[in-house]
Curated annotation (Swiss-Prot):
This is tRNA (guanine-N(1)-)-methyltransferase. Homodimer. The gene is trmD. It is found in: Cytoplasm. It comes from the Bacteria. The lineage of its organism: Bacteria, Pseudomonadati, Campylobacterota, Epsilonproteobacteria, Campylobacterales.
Length: 233
């Protein structure tokens, strides 16, 4: 898969792909990354890309024309591009979105700065808008990296053990159960003895119980969906 970033700050994003799982995926060509900078498509010698908002208001927007030219350059270089705009004025990105988007060939993230981008760019070019959470960031780069990470790990061959995807949070509407490692007793806190007996069926039952309890406590909204789903059976 190709991940394309329209950004004024390539150096904020590129180091994230230097190491760990995404670094290995990039090296093995499971994913590729590309960058397009609106400053390269400006008509002024100062490479200025900010513009005042029509109608007034605090802050600036990325100028519409260089941004549109940047998008057109992406379309000239890639086929069937799906454009995504990270913005707090949208629905929250979910694990289901990550799975669905992992099936596409070319994803392009338009990383806003200042107060964002002209809404007409969104209407004409953007396929999907997503929010990272109920808070404001200084730019779209961090959200785009989070979305990319979540999407990439659903691509075949990116994770070393793909079965681990089946046991993560949000699968089956539950948060992931707590996990433990050595030592058996840590600072007077012990692991449930069932984990130490090696009976995998009983361990799975225990994990399911713990996942239900964790979901009920931290995400009652999700737990209500679990109850509703069970009621339909």
């Amino acid at each position: 898969m190709n991940f394309i970033f329209i950004t004024l700050f390539e150096n904020l994003i590129r180091p994230y792909f230097d190491d760990s799982i995404l670094g290995r995926a990039l090296k093995n060509e499971k994913i590729k990354i590309y960058f397009f900078n609106p400053r390269d498509f400006t008509a002024n010698k100062y490479k200025k890309v900010d513009s005042y908002m029509i109608g007034g208001g605090a802050g600036l927007l990325i100028n519409t024309e260089p941004l549109a030219e940047t998008i057109k350059a992406v379309l000239e270089n890639f086929n069937e591009v799906r454009f995504i705009f990270p913005t707090p004025a949208a629905k929250k990105f979910t694990q289901n979105d990550a799975k669905r988007l992992s099936k596409y060939k070319n994803l392009c993230f338009i990383c806003g700065r200042y107060e964002g981008i002209d809404e007409r760019i969104v209407e004409k070019y953007v396929n999907e808008v997503f929010c990272l959470g109920d808070f404001i960031l200084t730019g779209g780069e961090l959200a785009a990296m989070c979305f990319t990470d979540a999407i990439a790990r659903n691509i075949k061959g990116v994770l070393g053990n793909e079965k681990s995807l089946d046991e993560e949070s949000f699968e089956n509407l539950l948060l992931e159960a707590p996990e433990f490692t050595k030592p058996d007793i840590f600072e007077n806190l012990s692991i449930n003895s069932e984990f130490l007996k090696g009976n995998h069926n009983k361990i799975q039952v225990l994990k399911n119980q713990m996942a239900n309890s964790k979901t009920r406590f931290f995400r009652p909204d999700m737990f209500r969906k679990v109850i509703a789903k069970k009621g339909k059976k």
